[in-house]
Amino acid sequence: MSLKVNILGHEFSNPFMNAAGVLCTTEEDLRRMTESESGSLIGKSCTLAPRTGNPEPRYFGLPLGSINSMGLPNLGVDFYLSYAAQTHDYSRKPLFLSMSGLSVEESVEMVKKLAPITKEKGTILELNLSCPNVPGKPQVGYDFDTTRTYLQKVSEAYGLPFGVKMPPYFDIAHFDMAAAVLNDFPLVKFITCVNSIGNGLVIDPANETVVIKPKQGFGGLGGKYVLPTALANVNAFFRRCPDKLVFGCGGVYSGEEAFLHILAGASMVQVGTALHDEGPIIFARLNKELQEIMTNKGYKTLDEFRGRVKTMD
C-alpha cells in the first residue's frame, strides 16, 4: 500500500501538509514541519513587507473548531524567499510558498522574486486569493473580474505553474463562474479549497462579549464547522476543472476526513485547526488512520478512490 502522490513534478510521501497560516511563520515552525511526517509544507501567506497583523485576541478555540481574525501576520516575503533559497531541505520534502499581496502590483512584485528560486529549487507557489481577515480588503476570490486580473498579471510575471487558494463558495452559479475563470489560465495547476468561512461571529454567553478583538468579533471559522463546505468546494472544482488538481483544506482531524477529501477529489490534504491544536505529531496519526481505512476497503493507492464519491442520481 502507498500514500504517495506524484504531482507537479514532485513525489510526495503522503498527501498531508499544513494549511498556510498554521505552524509556518518562523524558521522554527518550518523546521518542525519539515521534520514531521507530513508529505509537504507551506509557508505563511506573506506580503511584501512584514506585518504584525490584527490586535489580540485574534484566535479562539471552539468545541468544533476555531474562529480567527489574524490579519496576515508574517515576516515579509524576503524572509520566506530566503528560507526557500537557502534553508529548506528539499531532500526531505517539497516546499510550497503562499503569497497574499495586498494589491495585484504587490503580488506581481513578489512572484517575480520567487520565479528564479522556483526554477532552481522547485519551490511551488500558492497564490492566496481568499484572506477574509484584513480590514478594508475584500476577498479577491469573490470578485471574478478582479480574480481574472490577478491571474492574468501573475501568470505573465511568474511564467511558471502555480496554484490558487480560494474562498468557500455557497452557490452553484459561483462554482461555475469561478471555474470558468480558473480554466482560462493554463498555468494554474492546482486549486486549494477552502480558506476559512469568513465573518462568523462567536459570543461568550457568560460575559455577553465577542471572543476575538478585530472587526467587532467577526472572523473566519475553521475546523469541523467547515468540513461539509470544504468537501463541496473540492468536489465542485474537481468536476469543473478536469485539467487541474484540487487540494482539500477544512475540517481534517482524522484519517476519515482526509479520506473524504480525497474521495471528493483532493490530491493533497491540508490541515489547519487540528494541527494548531495537536502540533506536528498529528501527521503520524493521520497517515496511520488513512492507511487503516484503505486496508479495510481494499485500496492500494490513493488514485483508486480519488474523486470516486458516489452520487444517488
UniProtKB/Swiss-Prot annotation:
GO terms for molecular function: dihydroorotate dehydrogenase (fumarate) activity; dihydroorotate dehydrogenase activity. Optimum pH is 7.8. Binds 1 FMN per subunit. Pfam families: DHO_dh (PF01180). Substrate binds at K44, N68, S69, M70, G71, L72, N128, N133, N195, S196. Its cofactor is FMN. PANTHER family: DIHYDROOROTATE DEHYDROGENASE (FUMARATE), DIHYDROOROTATE DEHYDROGENASE (QUINONE), MITOCHONDRIAL-RELATED. Homodimer. This is Dihydroorotate dehydrogenase (fumarate). It comes from Trypanosoma brucei brucei (strain 927/4 GUTat10.1). The lineage of its organism: Eukaryota, Discoba, Euglenozoa, Kinetoplastea, Metakinetoplastina.
